[in-house]
């Protein structure tokens, strides 16, 4: 018999302070310094971990202040039995797409199970001896960044095996707008598992609530979730899914990531541009991998030589990529955070992609990886529209019906004041 389970978002006044409204424009150079992440609220969630055997999904972004979450919990006497690692690995030093194996972490001696290697989802055997699962990873709010897919697989595993999951919410640095084509289910992959736009404007906690509420999980996980009761959890009252909210955060808030997010998202400017410039991964153009400004430099050796020039070379974040050792010509989209925000202007910017195709001399080879481009776009329509010379306005208009539908769904699951 399925036991009664509890899905709960921590909202009690004694535990949480509701997000405060901000009157500032989303285009501002300074970060909101008073934001407290879910992970930082140790006093709220420690009670649920004491005396338990823990499995934690974490990477280098899992910090409490200046200390890694794993170190924080171990110092507090929490028994971490296993660490699960996402794309780029637990320590965040693997290339994009690089398969990572299982190993024992040298610093802590704790086994690390990779969920971006031979498998993407924990097995029942991986978690059978655990009392509770914890998820604490900083996301960037973009559909094709794989951490939301990893979170979904982790959540499904928890539900399917009746293990409580504690999710420590973190701000989304790209949550100040919602834009892009909504994914066509025919193009479902690990870089896009659900019918959401490229930039969906939700924290990972809100996104998880949407997965639950819209029944977008596996059949078994959805069936288990149907038995939930919303109530106030205590150490003696089991919950099945618990979100620890951020404090002093809204979807207008500016949040500068305290830790480099991945080898190819080394600074906030790259994070802001990523929803737009990652589409270039499916083209013949370099997206700046192998430079100090990945996703800020865009170019190709055959573009006009009076354009911005850069030369990709192997580095920590890109051991192999496009056009190594060749001078590429194109765009430097970087600048200060405020300047980049003005360039992004709260939407997916298609103008660089459209212009690049227009001036590219060998049109037939522009979309060098068509299947990859379609997976990133979430459809096969965008490529056709660009080839047909459609304007940005025409393309954006084609997104609107599905985008409007998604915005209504999104609103149901927001835990923080919205940007509009």
Question: What is the meaning of each model-derived region?
Answer:
Residues 1-28:
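Bacterial Sec-dependent N-terminal signal peptides
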Residues 81-88, 168:
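Short internal beta-strands
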Residues 92-97, 166-188:
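Glycine-rich, charge-decorated loop segments at or immediately adjacent to ligand/cofactor-binding or catalytic sites
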Residues 101-130, 142:
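Glycine-rich oxoanion-binding loops at beta->alpha junctions
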Residues 232-242, 247-324:
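Glycine-rich, aromatic-lined ligand/substrate-binding cores of catalytic
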Residues 139-151:
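Glycine/threonine-rich flexible loop motifs
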